[in-house]
Amino acid sequence: MSIRRLPEHLVNRIAAGEVVERPASALKELVENSIDAGARRISVSLSEGGLSAIDVADDGCGMTPDEIALALERHATSKLPDDAIEAVTTLGFRGEALPSIGSVADLTIESRVRGADGWHRRVDHGELVGEGPAALPPGTRIRVSNLFAKVPARRKFLRSARAEYAACVDVIKRLAMARPDIGFTLEHEGRRAILVAPDEQRVDRVAALTDRDLAQNSVAVDFRREAVSLTGVAGLPTFNRGVADHQFLFVNGRPVKDRLLIGAVRGAYQDMLARDRHPVIALFVELPGDQVDVNVHPAKTEVRFRDPGLVRGMIVGGLRAALDEAGHRSVQRPSVAALGNWQAGGLPTASSTAPAIPNGFAFGAAAERSGQGSVWDRVADFAPAPMARAEPAYSPPPQQASYPMGVARGQVAATYIVAEAEDGLVIVDQHAAHERLVLERMRRAMADGGVARQALLLPEVVELDEVGCDRLETRIAELAEMGLELERFGPKAMLVRATPALLGQGDVHGLIVDLADELAAYDEALSLKERLDHVAATMACHGSVRAGRTLSVAEMNALLREMEVTPHSGQCNHGRPTWIKLGHGDIEKLFGRK
């Protein structure tokens, strides 16, 4: 077959295959056009998730009749006046959206500029159907119906109306977050799904479109390096989700789903979230136009940075700095909903009455605030349980002090510390909290030149498979800087001579086995310092006090005081909360007083 020029309608359909993948793709292009037109309010109406109809109306600058006709031709645009694609500042610039949509759907455009009459033009799958005067306020209205009706090969790949509607909602959310100065309305089958007013604060806009509790469970991000700025809202690590749908990333006001940015976010949260949990976050990167290429993807959802290392480092560093300021904060969402399942019961019978002072509780004088150095300089290791010290397990409770984490009142199931604060009741998971404290202490020690070692009285032999031993052997020098002294002991064993002093009397065998497993997931080209958080987290887990360990009140208060001054103490190394608080109002609700 000889080479021939394709007809215009077929060219448009091919182009539409790249630009218009589903109703959400068409909606994105239309709303971006409205934003570029200077609209202050944008209204969207959907039918059957956009499969039947998409209506977009705005109060932007509008178009003249000649401009409407020109807008339906390929590569006709008003957004590149100087043909400087490297310095593009608008969301659209190729001039492909309207002709592409018009080639695979029934498209009607109504528009009016201020001081002139309105005009409409209708195109059905690339064929002009009609045009003429139209009555409408200044701005533009566009209706897309019967998408892919004459392209069955494409329509059969569309998903259900519910799935397509969800994709459309995601598009509007992202664009609305990018432009809090614009008001957005989304209706589906006559029901209003989104309504946000113009000129909102960014944090309020993000919270309104994601989770109302985000404002109370997030930190502001504001970081600058050279000509690049990073702003936004980052949820606390304990305020997480099981899917990554609540991560919103923007570059120069453009919503993107860029792997570099997603990886940077994951890196910033890596030791604060479990692998199957994801942060709630909205980040806005602003940088000069010549430092980023937005013309690398048909839908413009991916970008390419001139200096990706700078951007990634900035995101990781900026998020880390913001999360450090959160200190010991954890999710403040009341736990009353979960506790509401409790049923009020009658008084216990005589046979079931518990002792006046349960064995699982230990009361005593509260520890004083520490002076110079760490609280743990005074309580380096947990002291024996009260029974082992031959001292009374009960003494009058201390006076309530103005400590953010409260004063320890007891221990439940030898696992949870119960503390009384001025504004409620604090419950702390002792293992999770101590695990975070040990990790942060190891980080500080590494930053100061290395972790002190604690020699074992009798070196311990740990048997592993040969591959695991090989991995550990290649990292012996690096592990030594972290306080772990190893040497090869035959083909399938490692000899442990010293462990990090910070870990105390931990499970040496379990630590070595877990480290070997961690190293199996590493790129051999990376040093352990580049994976410090992973290695230190593994060590900290084995060096922290376990659930089931009875603590004295002094030990509990020492832990609470260090939590108050330690970054990220609100979540453990796996992203779980280390403490929760029940406010006085929450407790009163449980007892029906409110």
Curated annotation (Swiss-Prot):
Keywords: DNA damage, DNA repair
GO biological process: mismatch repair
Any GO CC annotation of this UniProt entry: mismatch repair complex
CDD domains: HATPase_MutL-MLH-PMS-like (cd16926), MutL_Trans (cd00782)
Matches recorded under InterPro entries: DNA_mismatch_repair_CS (IPR014762), DNA_mismatch_repair_MutL (IPR020667), DNA_mismatch_S5_2-like (IPR013507), HATPase_C_sf (IPR036890), MutL/Mlh/PMS (IPR002099), MutL/Mlh/Pms-like (IPR038973), MutL_C (IPR014790), MutL_C_dimsub (IPR042120)
Pfam families: DNA_mis_repair, HATPase_c_3, MutL_C
GO molecular function: ATP binding; ATP hydrolysis activity; ATP-dependent DNA damage sensor activity; mismatched DNA binding
Domain of life of the organism encoding this protein: Bacteria
Similarity section: Belongs to the DNA mismatch repair MutL/HexB family.
Role this protein plays: This protein is involved in the repair of mismatches in DNA. It is required for dam-dependent methyl-directed DNA mismatch repair. May act as a 'molecular matchmaker', a protein that promotes the formation of a stable complex between two or more DNA-binding proteins in an ATP-dependent manner without itself being part of a final effector complex.
PANTHER family to which the protein is assigned, alphabetical: DNA MISMATCH REPAIR PROTEIN MLH, PMS, MUTL, DNA MISMATCH REPAIR PROTEIN MLH1
Protein name: DNA mismatch repair protein MutL
The organism of origin for this protein: Rhizorhabdus wittichii (strain DSM 6014 / CCUG 31198 / JCM 15750 / NBRC 105917 / EY 4224 / RW1)
Originating gene: mutL
